[in-house]
UniProtKB/Swiss-Prot annotation:
ATP binds at G7, V8, P9, R10, A11, G12, K13, S14. A motif (DEAH box) lies at residues 95-98. GO terms for molecular function: ATP binding. Belongs to the inovirus G1P protein family. The gene is I. GO terms for cellular component: host cell membrane; membrane. One of its GO terms (biological process) is viral extrusion. Interacts with G4P; this interaction results in a complex that spans the inner an outer host membranes. The chain crosses the membrane at residues 213-235. InterPro entries: P-loop_NTPase, Zot_N. This is Gene 1 protein. Keywords: ATP-binding, Host membrane, Membrane, Nucleotide-binding, Transmembrane, Transmembrane helix, Viral extrusion, Viral release from host cell.
Length: 440
């Protein structure tokens, strides 16, 4: 299996490789090939409680110049790629791996690429490290199974801790987060290897040029705490200011006696009528949509206007009829359900329910308003004198009662002087041909 440690410098990549990979492998007697700065046999042997000779036999330190040619396969006589026997069941650790397998279009040498392809098949594992996985050649990156990302916690003032986020591969070069944890540095691990280059003396965490999150929040925290304290004081004072003072003398009986006659309850001209709380809203537990349907009962009487069964589904239409015999609203079952009502079709009609509110719609008889089928006839007085128009229908007396009081007239036909179309006579026309020179 190929494990990749990623993170900024001093985040804990090499620390994790030593503590969680190299030391456990040596303790189990496993061969380790490490390209890591400053590993010390004597200190590792003392830390593990092993003989220094055993550590020197198991731990092989690889120089930078030997990495590319050491970790490579060989071909047998048949041309088959074979991994050297010394790497079988071994652990390979390479720091700054991008220096040896840099990301470029040029493919790796077949011997090198086959080494990483065959290492896991021969019982070997590898831990490789760099600051950015995209600096690594794709032929090696595609074979990474686990990726661990290391993060410093100096931004929140935790110099002695670091954060590790764990990823697992889903496809070559792609990873999915599977967890993470915050760990504490073990000071006993640092002397076992060189975390800094030889001769470097400034090993403290650099803190200039910025602030951690707590320093940035200190001023805001002080302001919010002050405002919060003032707010809590006035909040508590609001509920405790009206409590009776135990040292305050009690009011006399004459001051607490209730008025017993008319007008005694008036003080400064204002009646001492107790304020009645508003009545509870019976529809308070309904939504706005449910309330709309419930309030239709104030506008009219509910009625089942039609009912049908289509296939295995019931269809029905509900109306609300007002006092003027007009339909103020009509909804079908699907609309009522959309408005939040439970609808059930029963033998006597339709039952609507929303919580504790229930309405029943039955098919009570109702006659829809019908407009008059007969045309109205208007009788007008011929001289327009003060009379009103008589209104009559085909089945009435033609407004005879009005005609008894208003003098009527007859509309007669009279010819016009110039004639009336089409009774006027047609125009007579004549044509003539003027005399020609031959006739003259």
């Amino acid at each position: 299996m190929l494990v990749f440690n990623e993170g900024v410098p001093r985040a804990g990549k090499s620390y994790d490789a030593v503590k969680n990979h190299i030391l456990p492998a040596l303790k189990k007697g496993r061969r380790v090939f490490a390209r890591l700065n400053g590993l010390r046999f004597d200190r590792i042997a003392k830390h593990l409680g092993m003989a220094e000779n055993d550590v020197q036999h198991l731990l092989v330190l690889v120089d930078t110049k030997d990495v590319s040619k050491l970790f490579a396969c060989t071909q047998d006589e048949s041309g088959k790629w074979c991994i050297p026997d010394e790497f079988k069941d071994a652990l390979v650790v390479i720091d700054e791996v991008h220096e040896f397998y840099v990301n470029e279009r040029k493919p790796l040498a077949p011997a090198v690429e086959n080494f990483w392809a065959l290492l896991g098949q021969n019982g070997g594992d590898a831990v490789i490290m760099t600051q950015w996985i995209n600096r690594l050649h794709s032929a090696v990156k595609a074979r990474i199974e686990k990726k661990n990302t290391f993060q410093k916690l100096t931004a929140i003032g935790m110099k002695g801790r670091y954060r590790v986020t764990y990823f697992h591969t889903t496809s070559p070069g792609k990873f999915e987060k599977v967890g993470g944890q915050t760990l504490k540095y073990d000071p006993a691990i640092f002397p076992l290897y060189d975390g800094y280059a030889p001769g470097a003396e400034n090993t403290e965490v650099y803190e200039e040029g910025g602030k951690n999150v707590w320093a940035a929040m200190a001023v805001r925290a002080a302001i919010f705490l002050t405002l919060g304290g003032v707010g809590i004081y006035f909040f508590m004072h609001y509920f405790t200011k009206d409590r009776a003072d135990p040292n305050k003398p009690m009011a006399s009986a004459s001051q607490t006696t209730k008025p017993t006659h008319v007008g005694a309850g008036f003080a400064n001209g204002a009646p001492s009528v107790p304020i009645q709380p508003p009545p509870p809203d019976p529809l308070a537990d309904l939504t706005q949509e449910q309330r709309y349907v419930a309030q239709l009962a104030d506008k009219g009487r509910i009625r089942l206007s039609a009912r049908a069964r289509v296939g295995d589904q019931d269809r029905a239409w509900i109306q609300w009829i007002d006092a003027s015999n007009n339909v103020v609203e009509e909804l079908d079952l699907s609309q009522l359900r959309a408005l939040g009502y439970s609808v059930s079709v029963v033998t006597y009609g339709v039952r609507l329910s929303a919580g504790k509110h229930i309405m029943v719609a039955t098919a009570w008889p109702w006659t829809a308003p019908i407009r008059e089928k007969d045309a109205r006839l208007y009788n007008m007085a011929p001289d327009g004198s003060g009379g009103a128009a008589g209104v009559a229908t085909a089945g009435s007396d033609g407004g005879g009662a009005d005609r008894d009081q208003v003098r009527g007239g007859v509309i007669e036909y009279g010819p016009r002087t110039q004639g009336t179309f089409p009774d006027n006579k047609g125009y007579s026309s004549s044509t003539s041909t003027p005399a020609t020179t031959l006739q003259m």
